[in-house]
Regions:
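Active-site-adjacent structural elements in enzyme catalytic cores
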Residues: 1-130
Length: 130
């Protein structure tokens, strides 16, 4: 990877924001497991705190970390459409920060189809991004 890519990974690990491409738009990302980092997204966008964010993950194996009681049809959708522009709204695990979900009992999960976004998620390793 490039020095800019390595810097983006370091910024995410430090609780900062980065812009990253997906297959549809550029997103503003932060460590979704870090409420202080998530708050920076809301501040940067001027987004109301009760509007949930989408958590980008690098694959199916990260779903159970973020969601519980995932129905069989959701796994079928993941298999058919991930990576890609499909966000699944699932029941969140108890530890998922309310800052991410807007205080809701659900979390939106997505595996982006852009190779740079996927590599950024893989390199981040200690947590997904938003």
């Amino acid at each position: 990877m490039t020095p800019d890519f390595d810097r983006a990974v370091a910024l995410l690990r430090a609780g900062e924001l980065v812009a990253f491409p997906t297959e549809t738009v550029y997103g503003l990302g932060a460590d979704a497991a870090n409420p202080a980092a998530v708050a920076k997204i809301f501040a940067a966008k001027g987004r109301p705190a009760d509007h949930p964010l989408i958590v980008h993950i690098c694959g199916h194996d990260a779903v159970d970390r973020w969601a519980e009681q995932v129905p069989a049809f959701a796994w079928e959708l993941m298999e058919a459409f991930w990576p890609g522009p499909l966000t699944l709204i699932l029941k969140k695990q108890a530890w998922v920060p309310d800052a991410v979900t807007g205080g809701q009992e659900t979390v939106g999960l997505r595996v982006p189809g852009h190779p740079l976004a996927l590599e950024l998620l893989r390199q981040r390793m200690t947590g997904p991004t938003l």
